Structures are given as C-alpha cells and as structure tokens.
Amino acid sequence: VHWTAEEKQLITGLWGKVNVAECGAEALARLLIVYPWTQRFFASFGNLSSPTAILGNPMVRAHGKKVLTSFGDAVKNLDNIKNTFSQLSELHCDKLHVDPENFRLLGDILIIVLAAHFSKDFTPDCQAAWQKLVRVVAHALARKYH
C-alpha cells in the first residue's frame, strides 16, 4: 500500500487527538448494538442484553480500548500493516473463528465514531485517508483466512 505524505499526516494528526479508551469503547459497543450477531464472539463478557447493558459493560470498554490500542499499531506502522497484524490475524482466524466481514464492519463504525468526535477535523480528505486505513487493516486481519 502506498501512502502519500498528506494521507500519513491526516491519519497521524487525527490519531494524536484520539482518546483510545473512550473511542475504542464506543466503537466496540456500537458494533455489538448495531450488529447484534457479533455478540456471539463475546459471550464471556456477561450482560449484553440491551444497548444500556453493552454501553455500561466494563469488559466491552476494556476490550474496545485494547482493539483501538492495536489499531494504533497500524498508525505507527503504516508501511508494514500486513506484518503488524499477522499474529492477530492468526488468532482471529484459527482460534476465535471470527468472520472477517466483522473487521470491515468495525472499521466502518470507527469512521463514524471519529467523525462524531472530530467533526471539524474530519474533512473529506481526512475521511478518505481513514477509509483507506481501515480497509487496509481489515484486509491485513483477514489475511490468514483460507
């Protein structure tokens, strides 16, 4: 994947403003609420019976932070995303059996969360760079699938 200097700047500039815990928790909660079939991968998280329960669930918050923290690894390694997510791809494919389509869904939700939090900074050019990034990350995570 080729990144222009402008794309890199737009991605890293916005990322520097992201509250990983807050945005990560919101993104994962939205995934579980908007696409309820994804909840089956999180059965061990306890009560996911309603949007209120999901939004208040400490395990959802913690895992959302973990997910977005690893997304930060993509931002730090824009030129090597495939290798950066190699082990996570294996884990989600071989052990967790997560449908790779869910990575795309989470990426789309992350775009919505970023737009909501940073509306002034989230210009069309910024959105285009982030759409490219979430697409590349989703592809890297789906790489180990057969």
From Swiss-Prot:
Report the domain of life of the source organism.
Answer: Eukaryota
Query: Do you know which SUPFAM superfamilies this protein is assigned to?
Result: Globin-like
In terms of PANTHER family, this protein maps to:
HEMOGLOBIN FAMILY MEMBER, HEMOGLOBIN SUBUNIT EPSILON
Q: Which organism is this protein's natural source?
A: Francolinus pondicerianus
Q: Which GO terms describe its cellular component?
A: blood microparticle; haptoglobin-hemoglobin complex; hemoglobin complex
GO annotation, biological process: hydrogen peroxide catabolic process
- Give the record's family classification: Belongs to the globin family.
Residues annotated to bind heme b:
H63, H92
Q: CDD domains under this entry?
A: Hb-beta-like (cd08925)
Assembly with partners or alone: Heterotetramer of two alpha chains and two beta chains.
Segments forming domain Globin: 2-146
Lineage of the organism:
Eukaryota, Metazoa, Chordata, Craniata, Vertebrata
Q: Could you tell me what this protein is called?
A: Hemoglobin subunit beta
UniProtKB keywords: Heme, Iron, Metal-binding, Oxygen transport, Transport
